């Protein structure tokens, strides 16, 4: 029986391969102008002179070829195909400084890879925090064997996103500034659905729609619900699930959720649906910001589009209760444990940075993948990749467990490149670290865990992820709040590096892009090719804050104290001055009255002296 199943799978794969197509795209990346929220027109990054950028669609087994030409003029770029494993094509993953050099203005590269995963994905720039300026869009891989195919009549793709009126290169210096010592992230100016607002989606009664939802935003998680309709979740992050009914879902930045939505049997009304940004993520709550974006399921265009009803609470479906459709059971106990503590703190330049443990990420001078390919037998030594890339070298096929302890007050969506992971445990908010809770003792992990590539961790909580290192490559693990990528919340997995050396060669056009950008392509993280353990000259973060008080700090403290004391004195003097003036005026009035009403004679000098004495007493008392 097992042999028959295997032969059937091989036959199905062979048929798909024979039917596979090559999907070609020429992407000229340019600046265009757009006003998606109707409030502010600004430059955005488009493709071929248009924005929003196109949806990439293909069938399972197809080859995608994208010829990217950077015509921005003032910025480098790259493309990452979020959620695709790039098995055998690690150099097509896209993060600059990791698997490629950034593509400078005027240069071109080709991304060429086969898609062997069905589901809902997206693509975006993975260079210098760039994608919130508009270089992000859906990527959909259709599956002829989609397990719910017989129930589906039509398909709908919805993107959710936050939106900024300022360009990211304007916001980054404001964010990474000593004038922002708490690391407060810039708050978006708007919430968008399909890169617009007040969208209508035409539907027909009595049909079932396969709705693919992608959060392509930079920061905000989004709550989503449809009035008068239920959602049956069938996929998260490219992994099919046993169907699960939900009234409301929560989607972090970078996550995807697919569900079946069956329309009503009549056309008596149109129904609103709502995307609402998670305000808990924002340090500031601008009074003029509308956190919501409303769309409508349009049954009849001639009928009105009602305002959405108020909801009593935001109570979304718990994605940890989902079960993978394929029944893949919990992986065995790990061969390697990776513990990552999320910390936000200031360095010596006064700027607030994000850390895993005591390391904030700094991009190496040589892309990490290129260091793997040029380092011979030293490729298994994590030291050559530089401590500031936070590298972990993994052996092929070992089971890896990541324990993330969130020592921060905020929520974080963590994404793993090159894999999806089994989400085997997530604590509640304020549960403390995994170790505080006794680790695995007393906990029951799901037999068939949910798998996905991006998962939310709660404030001051923890989570445990598990995956098999069966995809040789250099893969990032990072928070997908783009501000936290910029501030360093990134680690690097170097997986089966010796296998990579045997199987991978970098295309000439990718090396040419490095040359155009004056980026070395050999050596360790510092670009040293002679002594791979010599990291002198590597990119480093600012020095830590000095212990105790520096001379400048002592002087600043003294002046602050003096200023504070003077301030208190001024306040006290001001508070006493008015009663004193009133008392003095009252005494003077008494003296004048005594002079006028006294026995008709000249003013009594003794009484006058007494009055003056009384005024002196009042003055001293006050």
Curated annotation (Swiss-Prot):
Signal sequence range: 1-20
Coiled coil: none
Binding site for Cu cation 3: 126, 417, 478
Keywords for the protein's UniProt record, in alphabetical order: Cell membrane, Copper, Glycoprotein, Ion transport, Iron, Iron transport, Membrane, Metal-binding, Oxidoreductase, Repeat, Signal, Transmembrane, Transmembrane helix, Transport
Annotated membrane topology: Single-pass type I membrane protein
UniProt keyword Amino-acid biosynthesis, yes or no: no
Source domain of life: Eukaryota
Alphabetized InterPro entries for the sequence: Cu-oxidase-like_N, Cu-oxidase_2nd, Cu-oxidase_C, Cu-oxidase_fam, Cu_oxidase_CS, Cu_oxidase_Cu_BS, Cupredoxin, CuRO_2_Fet3-like
Pfam family, one: Cu-oxidase_2
Binding site for Cu cation 2: 82, 124, 480
Keyword Signal: yes
Membrane-crossing segments per the record: 553-573
Chain positions recorded as Cu cation 1 binding sites: 80, 415
GO cellular component: high-affinity iron permease complex
Protein name (record): Iron transport multicopper oxidase fetC
């Amino acid at each position: 029986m097992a042999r028959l199943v295997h032969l059937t799978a091989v036959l199905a794969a062979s048929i798909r391969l024979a039917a596979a197509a090559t999907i070609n795209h020429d992407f000229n990346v340019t600046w265009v102008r757009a006003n998606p929220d109707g409030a502010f027109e600004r430059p955005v990054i488009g493709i071929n002179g248009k924005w929003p950028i196109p949806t990439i669609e293909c069938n399972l087994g197809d080859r995608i070829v994208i010829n990217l030409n950077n015509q921005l003029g003032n910025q480098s770029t790259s493309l990452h195909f979020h959620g695709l494993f790039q098995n055998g094509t690690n150099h097509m993953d896209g993060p600059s400084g990791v698997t490629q050099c950034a593509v400078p203005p005027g240069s071109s590269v080709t991304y060429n890879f086969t898609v062997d995963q069905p589901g809902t994905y997206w693509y975006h720039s993975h260079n210098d925090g760039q994608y919130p300026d508009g270089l992000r869009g859906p990527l959909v891989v259709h599956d002829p064997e989609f397990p719910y195919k017989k129930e589906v009549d039509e398909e709908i793709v919805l993107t959710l996103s936050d939106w900024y009126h300022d360009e990211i290169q304007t916001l980054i210096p404001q964010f990474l500034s000593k004038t922002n010592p708490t690391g407060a992230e810039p708050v978006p100016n708007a919430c968008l659905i399909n890169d617009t607002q007040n969208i209508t989606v035409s539907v027909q009664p009595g049909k079932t729609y396969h709705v693919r939802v992608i959060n392509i935003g930079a920061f905000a998680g989004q709550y989503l619900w449809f009035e008068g309709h239920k959602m049956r979740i069938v996929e998260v992050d490219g992994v099919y699930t046993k169907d699960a009914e939900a009234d409301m879902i929560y989607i972090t930045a970078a996550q995807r959720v697919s569900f079946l939505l069956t329309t009503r049997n009549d056309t008596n009304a149109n129904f609103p649906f709502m995307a609402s940004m998670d305000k808990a993520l924002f340090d500031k709550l601008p009074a003029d910001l509308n956190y919501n974006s409303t769309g409508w399921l349009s049954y009849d265009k001639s009928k009105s589009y009602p305002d959405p009803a108020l909801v009593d609470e935001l109570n979304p479906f718990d994605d940890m209760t989902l079960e993978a459709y394929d029944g893949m059971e919990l992986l065995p106990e790990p061969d390697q444990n990776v513990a990552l503590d999320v910390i936000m703190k200031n360095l010596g330049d006064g700027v607030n940075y994000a850390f895993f443990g005591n390391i904030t990420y700094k991009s190496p001078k040589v892309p990490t993948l290129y260091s793997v390919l040029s380092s011979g037998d030293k490729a298994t030594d994590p030291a050559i990749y530089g401590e500031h890339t936070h590298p972990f070298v993994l052996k092929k096929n070992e089971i890896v467990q990541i324990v993330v302890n969130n020592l921060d007050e905020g929520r974080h969506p963590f994404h793993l490149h090159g894999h999806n992971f089994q989400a085997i445990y997530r604590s509640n908010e304020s549960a403390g670290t995994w170790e505080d809770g006794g680790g695995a003792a007393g906990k029951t992990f799901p037999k068939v865990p949910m798998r996905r590539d991006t998962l939310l961790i709660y404030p001051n909580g923890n989570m445990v992820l598990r995956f098999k290192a069966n995809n040789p490559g250099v893969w990032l693990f990072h928070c997908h709040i783009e501000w936290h990528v910029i501030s360093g919340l990134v680690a690097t997995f170097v997986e089966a590096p010796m296998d990579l050396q045997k199987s991978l060669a970098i295309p000439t056009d990718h090396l040419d892009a490095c040359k155009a950008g004056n980026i070395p392509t050999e050596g360790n993280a510092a670009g040293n090719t002679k002594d791979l353990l010599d990291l002198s000259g590597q990119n480093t973060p600012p020095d830590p804050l000095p212990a105790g008080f520096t001379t400048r700090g002592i002087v600043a403290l003294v002046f602050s104290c003096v200023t504070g004391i003077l301030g208190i004195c001024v306040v006290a003097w001001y508070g006493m001055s008015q009663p004193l003036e009133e008392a003095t005026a009252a005494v003077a009035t008494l003296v004048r009255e005594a002079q006028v009403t006294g026995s008709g004679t000249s003013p009594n000098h003794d009484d006058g002296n007494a009055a003056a004495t009384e005024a002196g007493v009042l003055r001293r008392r006050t």
